[in-house]
Amino acid sequence: MISKKLIIELLKQLISFKSVTPNDNGAIDFITNLLVKQGFKVYVKEFGQEYKVKNLYGYFGNGQPNICFAGHIDVVPAGFIEQWKYPPFCATQYKDKIYGRGVVDMKGAISAMLSAVFCFIDNNNDFNGTISFLITADEEGEALFGTKKMLEWINKQGHKIDFTILGEPTCTDKIGDTIKIGRRGSINFDLKVFGKQGHVAYPHLAINPNHLIVKILNSFIGSKIDEGNEFFAPSNLEVVSIDTNNNITNIIPEIAQSKFNIRFNDIHTNEQLLEIVKKNIEQFTTNYDLQSSCRSRPFLAKMSPYIFSFKELVHKVTKIKPEFSTSGGTSDAYFFKDYSPIVEFGLLNTMAHKINEYCLINDLQTLCRVYYNALCLFLMSNSKFRTN
């Protein structure tokens, strides 16, 4: 039986590390010690210039397939501490819930992964293949010195990963309802529209950039970028700010500025979207400045038999038929696309990053069973599924 006590105890210990991105605050060393005691070979690597980020890669066993559990130990800030029912970095178990910053995103999944792996190794000494972990402390921030760098290092060492399970919170209503197999891209825009300053009583002597930028933004909002496809919803533009830096009520300002974001599917590249945006703006003005930055591009995982087998496994363990999805924000899954097939599967995402973040203990146990049975499925020739 997979130990409920172990899952909860590991989660409580992980929450106690105030690992606000990109500082792991000792969490990487804690996980390293756990893995070493279990017989893993573990490498801890630090990357970065102005600051160093700790990452670990550990493996147990040998040969193929290499089933990799991946995740991040860093969390977002707790926000207003006084609004929390319980201290955010001191996990509190109350009735059927555990509260704490990072419980959902994603220390709960890491505790479930560790518990599942330790139980599997203790009960199966004749499995074929390798079990590995890739854990970073740089996902919630810029993600420059975490998974991306670690995968490059792993590849240079000659390690091949055959299938990756990333424990991001993917489910919406019940554990088992959603498996992420890709992600949309994200591109940010900073638009400045230039007009001509003047007195509000003499608009014919000025050019109002506010009127121009409103027309531009309305044209974006009122039209579809695309219709989406089999795996992706339509690309979506959201205006996040509009500003003139003008508090004087009788002045038409010279500059209006807006920031907006497009979450986009694999129908477009970020370069194509930039041209679409420019063309739209130039229907109204040519006197503008546009800056853009693309943090991540859309991707769809390699649709290997591992992914379809995992989907069937989730259905069998949870009794819920999961849907493949590419919705939500960006994640480190993008970095795996050139190295292995990958699924993202974890806890419910409804409480991620929120005040009083919590998860249900039953959900942790269910998630742990899925991870355990994935190892049985992929590493044991005569696997038997656990339901407890």
From Swiss-Prot:
UniProt cofactor note: Binds 2 Zn(2+) or Co(2+) ions per subunit.
Gene3D superfamilies: 3.30.70.360, Zn peptidases
UniProt binding sites for Zn(2+) 1: 72, 105, 168
Positions contributing to Zn(2+) 2 binding: 105, 140, 353
An example Gene Ontology molecular-function term: succinyl-diaminopimelate desuccinylase activity
Residue positions of the active site: 74, 139 (proton acceptor)
A family per Pfam: Peptidase_M20
Catalyzed reactions per annotation: N-succinyl-(2S,6S)-2,6-diaminopimelate + H2O = (2S,6S)-2,6-diaminopimelate + succinate
Record bears the keyword Amino-acid biosynthesis: yes
Pathway(s) per entry: Amino-acid biosynthesis; L-lysine biosynthesis via DAP pathway; LL-2,6-diaminopimelate from (S)-tetrahydrodipicolinate (succinylase route): step 3/3
EC number per UniProt: 3.5.1.18
GO biological process: diaminopimelate biosynthetic process; L-arginine biosynthetic process; lysine biosynthetic process via diaminopimelate
Cofactor: Zn(2+); Co(2+)
Similarity section: Belongs to the peptidase M20A family. DapE subfamily.
HAMAP family: DapE
Biological role: Catalyzes the hydrolysis of N-succinyl-L,L-diaminopimelic acid (SDAP), forming succinate and LL-2,6-diaminopimelate (DAP), an intermediate involved in the bacterial biosynthesis of lysine and meso-diaminopimelic acid, an essential component of bacterial cell walls.
Listed name of the protein: Succinyl-diaminopimelate desuccinylase
